[in-house]
């Protein structure tokens, strides 16, 4: 068993749907978790597919909620965005960018390959301080409500297995292979150092 609580981060593009659904589920299971986005702005579905609603990362979930409520309550209720923002507000005030976080994690889950690339690049560009390893694992999760929930449960299952592991470093690869077979998903995995 790990000697201390597993420190987990979940990262998607905007820190709104996939990472926050995982954050919600992992937190309910008692895990130490934070969530992040990697883009320069938060982008939410807008009135047309090519016209997203764009917010700065400093905008709180409550401010986004109120803005969308004012713009088109029916549309943003129907597409689930108001529900998502309400859930997010109960977890933390607003979205956070991974690149601005200086905390250390044992495992970082990313929800798409481009986010994985950004996280790995960011970690590799930082000056190494402690040489503590951090496992970065990518699992492709479509940015839909249903897929975010399914992905969050799979991330939770992996975290619970790691939390119970006698040696995370030795058991992680085997665990990921088992999860690939079970879930029919493939994972990218690398180790970076703080």
Swiss-Prot record:
Protein name listed in UniProt? RNA polymerase II subunit A C-terminal domain phosphatase SSU72 like protein 1
Quote the EC number.
3.1.3.16
The molecular function terms of the Gene Ontology recorded here are: RNA polymerase II CTD heptapeptide repeat phosphatase activity
Gene Ontology terms describing biological process: mRNA processing; termination of RNA polymerase II transcription
**Catalysed transformations (reactions):** O-phospho-L-seryl-[protein] + H2O = L-seryl-[protein] + phosphate; O-phospho-L-threonyl-[protein] + H2O = L-threonyl-[protein] + phosphate
Q: Which UniProt keywords apply?
A: Hydrolase, mRNA processing, Nucleus, Protein phosphatase
Signal sequence: where? Answer: none
Query: Where, subcellularly, is it found?
Result: Nucleus
Q: Which terms in the GO cellular component ontology are assigned? A: mRNA cleavage and polyadenylation specificity factor complex
What family is reported?
Belongs to the SSU72 phosphatase family.
**What PANTHER family does the annotation carry?**
RNA POLYMERASE II SUBUNIT A C-TERMINAL DOMAIN PHOSPHATASE
Q: Cross-referenced Pfam families, in alphabetical order?
A: Ssu72 (PF04722)
* SUPFAM superfamilies from the UniProt entry: Phosphotyrosine protein phosphatases I (SSF52788)
> Superkingdom, according to UniProt?
Eukaryota
Q: Which organism is it from?
A: Homo sapiens
Its biological function? Answer: Protein phosphatase that catalyzes the dephosphorylation of the C-terminal domain of RNA polymerase II. Plays a role in RNA processing and termination.
């Amino acid at each position: 068993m790990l000697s201390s609580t597993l420190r987990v981060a979940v990262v998607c593009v905007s820190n709104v749907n996939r990472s926050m659904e995982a954050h919600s589920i992992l937190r309910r299971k008692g895990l130490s978790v934070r969530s992040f986005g990697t883009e320069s702005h938060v982008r939410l579905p807008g009135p047309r597919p090519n016209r997203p609603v764009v917010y700065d990362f400093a905008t709180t979930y409550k401010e986004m909620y109120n803005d969308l409520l004012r713009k088109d309550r029916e549309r943003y209720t129907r597409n689930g965005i108001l529900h998502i923002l309400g859930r997010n507000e109960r977890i933390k005030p607003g979205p956070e960018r991974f690149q601005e976080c200086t905390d250390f994690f044992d495992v970082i889950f990313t929800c798409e390959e481009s986010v994985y690339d950004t996280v790995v690049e960011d970690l590799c560009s930082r000056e190494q301080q402690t040489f503590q390893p951090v496992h970065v694992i990518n699992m492709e999760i479509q940015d839909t409500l249903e897929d975010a929930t399914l992905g969050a449960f799979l991330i939770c299952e992996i975290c619970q297995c790691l939390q119970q592991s006698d040696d995370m470093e030795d058991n992680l690869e085997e665990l990921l292979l088992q999860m690939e077979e079970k879930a029919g998903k493939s994972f990218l995995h690398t180790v970076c150092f703080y």
